[in-house]
A protein has these predicted regions:
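Short Pro-Cys-Gly-centered "Cys-loop" motif that presents a nucleophilic cysteine in a tight turn
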Residues: 1-16, 26-128
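Histidine-centered active-site/metal-ligand motif
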Residues: 19-21
Length: 128
C-alpha cells in the first residue's frame, strides 16, 4: 500500500524484534520522512492489532544516512542482510523470514526491487 501512496524503491530490509533496517530510495521528489512515518505507523498499527497490544512499537524516531558510493551501498546491503546472523537469531541470513535476502531467495518481489544479476553474483557468496 505504501508504494501506491508514495513513490519509492526498497533495495533491502530487515525487521528485527526492536528495530528495522531499510535501504529506501525516494523517487519523484518524495519526502523520506513522510514515507518512513507512514510505513512505521502502519506497521505499528498492524503489529498492535495482530498481538492485541497498544502503545509504542518503536523505541525512537527513525534515523537515516545517505549512501554516497557504490561500495557504501554494498557494505550497507550486506550489513542489513547479515543483521540476524550477527544477533545469533539464525545461522544463515536466508533463514531469517523478515529480511530482503529471504524474500529474494523465495522470489517474493512485492516489497523490494530485485537487484541486477551482476549485483547478486557479487554479494551472494558473502551472505550464504
Amino acid at each position: 500500500r505504501a508504494k501506491r501512496k508514495y513513490h519509492f524503491e526498497i533495495k533491502n530490509f530487515c525487521i528485527m524484534n526492536n528495530h528495522v533496517h531499510i535501504i529506501l530510495k525516494p523517487l519523484k521528489n518524495e519526502s523520506l520522512s513522510k514515507i518512513m512515518q507512514w510505513i512505521l505507523s502502519v506497521f505499528a498499527i498492524r503489529y498492535n492489532r495482530h498481538f492485541n497490544l497498544a502503545g509504542h512499537v518503536w523505541y525512537d524516531r527513525f534515523t537515516s544516512k545517505i549512501i554516497k558510493s557504490y561500495s557504501q551501498y554494498i557494505s550497507t546491503f550486506l550489513y542489513i542482510a547479515r543483521n540476524p546472523v550477527r544477533a545469533k537469531i539464525v545461522k544463515h541470513a536466508t533463514d531469517f523470514h523478515y529480511n530482503g535476502i529471504s524474500f529474494l531467495q523465495k522470489g517474493i518481489l512485492d516489497i523490494m526491487e530485485r537487484p541486477p544479476n551482476y549485483f547478486l553474483r557479487l554479494i551472494w557468496p558473502n551472505i550464504v
